[in-house]
């Protein structure tokens, strides 16, 4: 299926950089499931011959948003379409070559809204208290577009905001990586105050119609309960804790306003609030864990910890609301929540391999690669990465088994279709994260730039495009006009 050109932003080229001029579009609340790759040339307005010439001259970048479409297209064609679900990751850790393959048996795709999201990034960055250098490294537009390929523009953007929220809170927790003597207690107090106020902002949009939903969130607050009260069917923070305005409050307000306006009137947003509570509680745990330099984690404890502080469950809870087929009851199904946790753990293990060198330099012990090396001193970085990838494969098998069990447990076809749609959201997130890591091809626009992956992709994509141009010379010239 081809996308109509009306949904594609016009592109203006200035030197090597691209600026997208957004059209006045009306963004529907729902996009039908589409295969973005089927209309790659209509989206980028480029022919294979043009792309081949550009890649040969300038290489692959992330500052030309078209390149991500062509990279995803290539990976889908070379791997998924041929039944090969093992995607290469080539990087280094402390000089050791890390050459592994991430197993992920789901179809790659990329949102047709990525061009417009990329083009409006300066406007989006103005919401944050940040620098463009830091904002570019986070590159949340890329993450959301590749992990949420079938949602509307606004719904894709809100996922980008959730990922940004995680990264900017992570920036504050990063202070705890310093030696104990260098940690400033005042900054930790500020972080504790900030996350409590962020949590309160989400509570302000939570107006459950069902008393059970109110109690579900109230009980889940756990050690945060003393800070809040139940007032007229709402959960309200005691005013004495509203001591300051956190730096990223405009971002949090933007997220809350969107959820409140777009979803709350017609859908049950309780799970979004639940996942935010889980995440904020996880950050509180992280403050404790990182602050105690003698603290160690087993691999299972690490899994449990990461289940809480991964952004994907928050993003999934929002994405679930964007689709017509939706079952709130799924969240009270232990098997479904176990599937959610497996998803978080797989993403974490993939991330650990890709961040191992950066986190080694940061002396950050909370990485499965390092935890395994502590458990088995015979492992070097490369071998430990191999073991982590094996663990990720096993977790993927558990994910697939849970998927079948959940679908078989559906009481009727309508429920089965709703569950299938919600599981698909998590599958899209998994393959999206893999592609996000594979396509880190430009320094400064990825947290973990991979020069070896860049060289590999440039060589392979050049060969692939050259074959297309050779065997379909007319099509390669004219496809952009179709």
From Swiss-Prot:
Looking at the keywords, is S-adenosyl-L-methionine present? no
Keyword set, alphabetical order: Magnesium, Metal-binding, Transferase
UniProt remark on cofactor binding: Can also use Mn(2+) ions as cofactors with a lower efficiency.
Q: What is the effect of changing residue 447 to A?
A: Complete loss of activity
Q: Which GO terms describe its molecular function?
A: metal ion binding; transferase activity
Q: Where does Mg(2+) 1 bind?
A: 351, 355, 359
Effect the entry attributes to changing residue 167 to A = Complete loss of activity
What processes in GO biological process is this protein linked to? cellular response to carbon dioxide; cellular response to phosphate starvation
**Per UniProt, what does mutating residue 436 to A do?**
Reduced efficiency with L-glutamic acid (L-Glu) as substrate due to a reduced affinity
Q: What class of enzyme is it?
A: transferase
EC numbers, comma separated: 2.5.1.-
Q: What does this protein do?
A: Magnesium-dependent glutamate N-prenyltransferase: part of the gene cluster that mediates the biosynthesis of domoic acid (DA) and derivatives, natural products with neurochemical activity acting as ionotropic glutamate receptor (iGluR) agonists, thus being neurotoxins causing amnesic shellfish poisoning (ASP). Catalyzes the conversion of L-glutamic acid (L-Glu) to N-geranyl-L-glutamic acid (NGG) in the presence of geranyl diphosphate (GPP). Also able to catalyze the formation of farnesyl-L-glutamate from farnesyl diphosphate (FPP). Cannot use dimethylallyl diphosphate (DMAPP) as substrate.
**Family statement:** Belongs to the terpene synthase family.
Protein name (record): Magnesium-dependent glutamate N-prenyltransferase
Q: Which organism is it from?
A: Pseudo-nitzschia multiseries
Gene assigned in the entry: dabA
């Amino acid at each position: 299926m081809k996308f109509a050109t009306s949904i594609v932003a016009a592109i203006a080229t200035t030197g090597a950089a691209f600026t997208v001029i957004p059209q006045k579009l009306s963004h529907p609340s729902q996009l039908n499931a589409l295969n973005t790759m089927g209309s790659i040339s209509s989206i980028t307005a480029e022919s294979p011959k043009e792309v081949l010439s550009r890649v040969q001259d300038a290489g692959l970048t992330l500052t030309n948003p078209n390149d991500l479409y062509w990279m995803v297209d290539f990976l889908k064609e070379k791997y998924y379409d041929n039944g090969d679900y093992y995607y290469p990751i080539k990087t280094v850790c402390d000089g050791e070559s890390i050459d592994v393959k991430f197993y992920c048996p789901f179809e790659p795709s990329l949102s047709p809204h990525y061009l417009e999201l990329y083009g409006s990034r300066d406007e989006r960055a103005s919401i944050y208290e940040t620098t463009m250098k830091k904002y570019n490294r986070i590159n949340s537009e890329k993450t959301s577009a590749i992990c949420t390929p079938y949602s509307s523009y606004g719904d894709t953007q809100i996922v980008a905001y959730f990922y940004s929220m995680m990264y900017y809170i992570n920036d504050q927790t990063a202070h705890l990586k310093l030696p104990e003597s260098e940690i400033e207690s005042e900054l930790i107090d500020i972080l504790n105050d900030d996350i409590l106020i962020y949590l309160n902002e989400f509570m302000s949009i939570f107006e459950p119609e069902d008393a059970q939903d109110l109690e579900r969130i109230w009980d889940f607050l756990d050690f945060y309960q003393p800070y809040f009260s139940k007032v007229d069917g709402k959960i309200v923070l005691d005013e004495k804790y509203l001591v300051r305005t956190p730096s990223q409050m405009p971002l949090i307000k933007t997220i809350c306003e969107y959820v409140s306006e777009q979803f709350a009137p017609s859908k049950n947003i309780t799970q979004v609030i639940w996942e935010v509570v889980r995440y904020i509680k996880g950050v509180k745990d992280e403050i404790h864990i990182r602050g105690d330099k003698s603290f160690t984690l087993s691999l299972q404890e690490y899994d449990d910890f990461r289940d809480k502080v991964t952004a994907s469950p928050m993003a999934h809870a929002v994405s679930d609301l964007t689709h017509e087929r939706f079952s709130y009851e799924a969240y009270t199904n232990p098997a479904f929540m176990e599937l959610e946790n497996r998803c978080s753990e797989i993403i974490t293990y993939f991330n650990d391999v890709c961040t191992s060198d950066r986190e080694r330099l940061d002396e950050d012990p909370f990485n499965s690669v390092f935890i395994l090396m502590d458990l088995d001193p015979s492992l070097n970085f490369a071998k430990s990465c191999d073991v982590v990838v094996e663990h990720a494969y096993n977790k993927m098998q558990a994910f697939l088994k849970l998927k079948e069990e959940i679908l078989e447990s559906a009481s009727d076809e309508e429920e089965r279709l709703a569950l299938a749609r919600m599981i698909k959201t998590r599958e899209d997130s998994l393959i999206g994260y893999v592609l996000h890591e594979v396509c880190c091809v430009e320094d400064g626009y990825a947290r973990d730039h991979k020069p070896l992956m860049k060289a590999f992709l440039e060589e392979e994509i050049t060969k692939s495009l050259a074959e297309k141009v050779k065997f379909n010379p007319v099509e390669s010239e004219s496809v952009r006009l179709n």
